[in-house]
Amino acid sequence: MSDYKSTLNLPETGFPMRGDLAKREPGMLARWTDDDLYGIIRAAKKGKKTFILHDGPPYANGSIHIGHSVNKILKDIIVKSKGLSGYDSPYVPGWDCHGLPIELKVEQEYGKPGEKFTAAEFRAKCREYAATQVDGQRKDFIRLGVLGDWSHPYLTMDFKTEANIIRALGKIIGNGHLHKGAKPVHWCVDCRSALAEAEVEYYDKTSPSIDVAFQAVDQDALKAKFAVSNVNGPISLVIWTTTPWTLPANRAISIAPDFDYALVQIDGQAVILAKDLVESVMQRIGVTDYTILGTVKGAELELLRFTHPFMGFDVPAILGDHVTLDAGTGAVHTAPGHGPDDYVIGQKYGLETANPVGPDGTYLPGTYPTLDGVNVFKANDIVVALLQEKGALLHVEKMQHSYPCCWRHKTPIIFRATPQWFVSMDQKGLRAQSLKEIKGVQWIPDWGQARIESMVANRPDWCISRQRTWGVPMSLFVHKDTEELHPRTLELMEEVAKRVEVDGIQAWWDLDAKEILGDEADQYVKVPDTLDVWFDSGSTHFSVVDVRPEFAGHAADMYLEGSDQHRGWFMSSLMISTAMKGKAPYRQVLTHGFTVDGQGRKMSKSIGNTVSPQDVMNKLGADILRLWVASTDYTGEMAVSDEILKRAADSYRRIRNTARFLLANLNGFDPAKDMVKPEEMVVLDRWAVGCAKAAQEDILKAYEAYDFHEVVQRLMRFCSVEMGSFYLDIIKDRQYTAKADSVARRSCQTALYHIAEALVRWMAPILSFTADEVWGYLPGEREKYVFTGEWYEGLFGLADSEAMNDAFWDELLKVRGEVNKVIEQARADKKVGGSLEAAVTLYAEPELAAKLTALGDELRFVLLTSGATVADYHDAPADAQQSEVLKGLKVALSKAEGEKCPRCWHYTQDVGKVAEHAEICGRCVSNVAGDGEKRKFA
C-alpha cells in the first residue's frame, strides 16, 4: 500500500500547543525591556492624536495585592487598545510616597523622630523606605505585562514634584480658597494627627447612651412660656448623647425651631422633650406615670439658659436644622469643639469652640478635677458617675453603633478642634464650581456622577494641614502676633519651591527665615504643618501632567481607580484642579469594584481567602490573570478564586488553540505571493473573513466603551462557535487534501491569514504575551511588535446582494446543526462511526431546497458527510427526522456507499478506479497527480 501522507498539506507550526506562560512570559519581558518596547511604541505613535490615562498613584508600602493587579491591568488594556485605535497614549506610572503609613513603618524600625534620630534623618529614612517599596511594586507591575515608562515613573517625593505641590498650594492661596480656623477635625490619638475623610473607616463600637437633665436658670420664664403655674420640682431640658466624654466641652443645647416641645411632669421634676419622643423617652427612663403640662414650638425656647450639670456655667438653647426625631430627646448636646454640625451652629451663635482634649486624647489640665489627664475613652464612666452624683442622670444604657475609626490603627477617633488650615468650599464658590464641573465629565459607570455630586454637595471644608514629619511642608510664614499670612506669601512660596526643587522638602526645615525674610524674620514664624497626602496625589494633574514632556500640555483624558476613590483621589483632584484652574482635571472617570472571593466575601488574610497575584503569575501566567480581569464585569464586585481562574485558563486554551490552528495551516503561505483576490476566493472563505469583520466591529465598539467582558465574550464566540465548530472544521478537508498551490487551498489560507491578522490584534490589549508570541509566527513582512500597529484593515465580507450572502450561510449553519443531531443519534445507535461514514438526504421545502441545491456536490463538504442529496420535503420517508429549528427540513441518514479513501477518509464509489493510484478516490487522484479539484463554494 502506498503512503499518501507525504501528499497531504498537514498543519505545521513552531507555535507551541501549551502556553507554559509562567515559564515563557519572563523571557518575553526581558526582550521587551532590552528592545525598549515602550520607547519603540512612543516613536511609532509620535504625532498622532493623544489619549492620556493619568495613573492614580498607589501608596508606596507593601506588596501589590489582587486589587492593584485589577487596576493596573484595566489601565494597560485601555492604553494598548487606544494605541491600536491610532492614538498616542503614553502611560507614566506613579507612586504616592509621603504620609503616615511610611512614617509608622520607619518608626517601628528606628523609633520616633527626635528619639534616636533627628527629624531630618527620619525623613531621609522615610525617603529610603519609600524608594525600596517602589522598586518592589514596580517589578510586580512590570511582570503583569503592563507597558509604561517604568524607568521614569513619577514619585510624589521627587524634588520637582514636591516643589510643584507647594506651587499648587500657592495658586490656591492666590485664588482666595485658603483659611485658618480652630475647627473640629477627625483626630487619631494614636497618629496624633488630623485625618482626611478618606482615612476614616466605620466599625461597630459599644458606647454608653445617656439622658441628661440641664436645669433651667429662670424657672419662672419657662413656666410662662408653657403657660403653667403649678410644676412639682425643678424644670430641665433633657439631652441625649453617646459621647459622655464630650460634655465638658458643651456650650449649648440645640433644638428644632418647628418641633413641638412638651413640658412633662414626672416624679419630683418636670422635663422638656420633643412631644413626638415623649413616649419613647418615658419607656427608656422607666416612667409610667407622667403628665404633659403644656407644649410650645422650639423657636419659643431660643436663648433661654440652662445650667451645665457639673461645669459650673450655664448654656443657651439654640435653634438648629440638624436636630431630628430619629432618636434621643429632640434636644442635642452641642460641643462646637467636638463635632462639625456643632461647630457650624456654634459659629452662627458666636459660641466658644472649646477643646479641652490634648493631641494624645487626654483631658488638658484645668478641665475638671477628676478628668484632668484622663484618656477620653476611659472618661465615659467617670462622667456618668459625676452626673449620677449631681442628680442629672435620667438614664444610662450600653448601645452598639457605627463609629469612626482610624484606617491605619482601626482604633476609634475623636473630633477635636485644633488650629488647622482649610481649603474653603464656599468662600470663593469652590463647591458650586466643582458641582458644575462634575456635569461635564463622563462617569463610568454613570452612577459615579450622583455619588461624587452628593459627596461634594455635603462635604465640609477640606482640612489640608497635618502635624507630621514626612510630608510636603505648607511653606507658610505667619505673623507672631496677628497669625496673619505674610503679605508676600506667594512670592515666598515660590522662593521655597525653588529650593525644594534642588534639595527636596528638607530644604524647608533647613531654611533660616532670615534668608528670605531679612529683617522681618523676627516678626514671623514658620508654619510647621505638612500637607495632607491627598493634596500630594490630588495635585498631580498640575505637578505631573502639566509638566511631563510626553503629555505636551494635554490635560488627562481619564482617571481610573477603585470605587472608593470618589471620596479619595477623584475628589481631591477635582477640588485642587477647580480651585487652581476653575476646571476638572479629567474628561472621563472610570471606577472598578473591589475583589471578593468565589462566595462574594471580602478578601481577608484572617479568613485566608486572599488570592496573591504573584502566585497566579507563577502558576498560571500573567495572561490568565489579565484574561480574568477582562472577562469580569468590573462595574460590580469582582469575584476571584482558584476555580474562577481555572475557568479563565480554559477560555485561554480555546483562544490559543484557535490561534495555533490558524498558524499551523498558514504553513508555506507567503502573503506577498500566495494571496488570492477576494473575488476569486471560495465563497465560504469570504464568509469567514466577513465573520471576522463583524466580530471586529463588535470588539472595537466594546473596547471603545471600555466593555472588556464583552470583548472577551465576542472573542470566545468567534473562536468557539463561528470558527471552531463550523468553519475550521469544514476547511480541514480542503486545506489538507487539495493541491498545495491550488486556488482551493490558497483561498482558504488567504482567509486564515486575514483572520489571524485581525485576531492577534484583538488579543493584544488583553493577552499581551500570547499576542506577541503569535505575532512572531505570522507569515509576511511586519513590524517587530503588534503593539506599534493599529487594528487590521484588510477584512471584507459578502455583499447582501449576493445569493450566498451572510443570511445564506447562517441558514446553512442551522442545517448543519440539524444534520449533526441526526449523526450523533446514529453514532449512539452504532449505525455509523464518524460523520464521514454517513450519507444524508435533506428533504426540504422549495426555498431551502434551492439554497442547498445551489451548493451542488460541495454540500457534503459543509455537512462533513461522504454524501449529501436534496429532495422534496413531501417525499420524506417516515423515519426522516423533522428539524425543530427549520420547519421545512427533514433529515434522513444512511451509511455511505463505496469504500473509504485512505487519503481523504471520504467514502466514495470511485476508490481504485485509476490504476496508477489504485487505493485512492478520483478526487484525491486529481489532487495528487492531476490539475487538482476546483472548489467554488466550500
From Swiss-Prot:
Keywords: Acetylation, Aminoacyl-tRNA synthetase, ATP-binding, Cytoplasm, Ligase, Metal-binding, Nucleotide-binding, Protein biosynthesis, Zinc
Position of sequence motif 'HIGH' region: 58-68
GO cellular component, one term: cytosol
InterPro entries: aa-tRNA-synth_I_CS (IPR001412), aa-tRNA-synth_Ia (IPR002300), Anticodon_Ile_BEm (IPR033708), Ile-tRNA-ligase (IPR002301), Ile-tRNA-ligase_type1 (IPR023585), Ile-tRNA_ligase (IPR050081), M/V/L/I-tRNA-synth_anticd-bd (IPR013155), Rossmann-like_a/b/a_fold (IPR014729)
PROSITE patterns from the UniProt entry: AA_TRNA_LIGASE_I (PS00178)
Organism, as annotated: Shigella boydii serotype 4 (strain Sb227)
CC cofactor note: Binds 1 zinc ion per subunit.
HAMAP family found in the cross-reference section: Ile_tRNA_synth_type1
Localization (cell): Cytoplasm
MF (Gene Ontology): aminoacyl-tRNA deacylase activity; ATP binding; isoleucine-tRNA ligase activity; tRNA binding; zinc ion binding
Listed NCBIfam families: ileS
Catalytic activity: tRNA(Ile) + L-isoleucine + ATP = L-isoleucyl-tRNA(Ile) + AMP + diphosphate
Domain comment (free text): IleRS has two distinct active sites: one for aminoacylation and one for editing. The misactivated valine is translocated from the active site to the editing site, which sterically excludes the correctly activated isoleucine. The single editing site contains two valyl binding pockets, one specific for each substrate (Val-AMP or Val-tRNA(Ile)).
Family of this protein: Belongs to the class-I aminoacyl-tRNA synthetase family. IleS type 1 subfamily.
Sequence motif: 'KMSKS' region, positions: 602-606
Cofactor(s) annotated in UniProt: Zn(2+)
Record-listed N6-acetyllysine modification sites: K183
UniProt KW Metal-binding keyword: yes
Protein name: Isoleucine--tRNA ligase
One Pfam family this sequence matches: tRNA-synt_1
